UniProtKB/Swiss-Prot annotation:
Signal peptide: none annotated. It catalyses: Na(+)(in) + 2 H(+)(out) = Na(+)(out) + 2 H(+)(in). The gene is nhaA1. One of its GO terms (biological process) is regulation of pH. It is found in: Cell inner membrane. Belongs to the NhaA Na(+)/H(+) (TC 2.A.33) antiporter family. This is Na(+)/H(+) antiporter NhaA 1. HAMAP family: NhaA. Na(+)/H(+) antiporter that extrudes sodium in exchange for external protons. The keyword Transport applies. InterPro entries: Na/H_antiporter_dom_sf (IPR023171), NhaA (IPR004670). It comes from Campylobacter jejuni subsp. jejuni serotype O:6 (strain 81116 / NCTC 11828). It holds the Pfam family Na_H_antiport_1.
Length: 389
């Protein structure tokens, strides 16, 4: 995976700094929610924002605009990156796909199994099986960058590559398992929007306004269809042309223009809106409930075990190789960091249980504690026990 290092060097630095900003926004949300401004914080998130065109009306709380709208842009960027890597990047070589794919697969299966084992027999709680399968890449990358120069750049790229498959897994989980009542009419409109983008792509049309209009129609129709609106983001990305008829980079230009807004606006706002756990309402007894224990074990134990085990098996049976210049100890350290589920786990938690206080916020606290433990232990392990050989 050598040639991808230089290509993503700037992205690594930006996402690392963005990760620090996420930490600040998380702490700020906790302080505001548990301080004298808690009422204003909740009013801000519940503020109704919307528009109407004729009989059509879309009116939702600001929190849902963030979780359904802004986060769709994040998945759109993931889709652009995925397409770029498969067509012209390292993923064009199937051998480079195996390690991050297997790592992501292990990081989904093992945490989900642990959560299910702890909560077997409780149908409602089992709805949250996907909560510990997620990784907050920006946070994990920020911690990895803090570990210093003795961590090979190839491991940073491995984490980014793993994140792509992890996010695709999250999209599939959301689309398949967390949907509500489906609307055929909305699906038809979504199909028309997709067909329009396909035609634009085939004709080589690279007017951004055309794709923007189609993507908005697709987003609204997917939102109304019952499938989570984030799916619209990655679908749109697949139809963005790689270049213009003159050979100028089109997809790359769009991707580069989004990076700043993702790192410094969208993801920090998402963290601020979702990390405000009301600690005063938490029932201490609920912390040791099945949902909390399942989330903690899934994130802190399941993620590192699953990612490392599946990675090791791929390497052991020669389907893949260790990232250049790294050793198994360092690889394991990165696997620990994948237990930082934070914003993505909170997001899936909201989809799974809808009523956020059903467990007296113990589920949210478990996500924060498990993510904190994964970050601290991962940093200590990489910094002091996994030095470069």
């Amino acid at each position: 995976m050598n040639n991808i290092v230089h290509k993503l060097k700037t992205l690594v630095l930006n996402e690392a700094f963005g990760g620090v900003l996420l930490i600040v926004c998380t702490l700020l949300a906790l302080l505001v929610q548990n301080g004298s401004f808690s009422e204003h914080y909740r009013e801000f998130l519940n503020l109704k924002v919307g528009f109407s065109v004729g009989e059509f009306e879309l009116n939702k709380p600001f929190l849902l605009w963030i979780n359904d709208g802004l986060i769709s842009i994040f998945f759109f960027a993931i889709g652009l990156e995925l397409k770029k890597e498969f067509l012209h990047g390292d993923f064009k070589n199937p051998k480079n796909i195996v390690l991050p794919f297997m790592a992501a697969l292990g990081g989904i299966l093992i945490p989900a199994m642990l959560f299910a084992l702890v909560n077997i027999g409780d149908a409602y709680t089992l709805k949250g099986w996907a909560i510990p399968t997620a990784t907050d890449t920006a946070f994990a990358l920020a911690i990895l960058m803090m570990c210093g120069k003795h961590i090979p750049s190839s491991l940073k790229i491995f984490l980014l590559s793993l994140a792509i498959f992890d996010d695709v897994g999250a999209i599939l989980i959301i689309a398949i398992f967390y949907t509500t009542k489906l609307s055929i009419v909305a699906f038809v409109v979504a199909g028309i929007a997709i067909l329009a983008m396909l035609v634009l792509n085939i004709l080589g049309i690279t007017r951004k306004s055309f794709y923007f209009i189609c993507s908005v129609i697709l987003w609204i129709s997917v939102l109304k269809s019952g499938v989570h609106a984030t799916l619209a983001g990655i679908i749109t990305a697949f139809f963005i042309p790689m270049q213009t008829k003159n050979g100028e980079a089109f997809l790359e230009e769009i991707y580069e223009s989004l990076k700043f807004w993702l790192a410094f606006v969208i993801l920090p706002l998402f963290a601020f809106a979702n990390a405000g756990v009301n600690l005063s309402n938490i029932d201490i007894g609920a912390i040791f409930s099945g949902v909390s224990v399942g989330i903690f074990l899934g994130l802190f134990v399941g993620k590192q075990v699953g990612v490392f085990l599946f990675s090791y098996l791929a390497i052991r049976f020669k389907f893949a190789a260790l990232p250049q210049g790294s050793n198994l100890k360092q690889l394991y350290g990165v696997c620990i960091l994948t237990g930082i589920g934070f914003t993505m786990s909170l997001f899936i938690d909201g989809l799974a249980y809808e009523v956020s206080d059903i467990f007296n916020y113990a589920d949210n606290l478990a996500i924060l504690i498990a993510s904190f433990c994964s970050g601290i232990w991962g940093f200590i392990y990489l910094k002091f026990f996994a030095a470069r050989s």
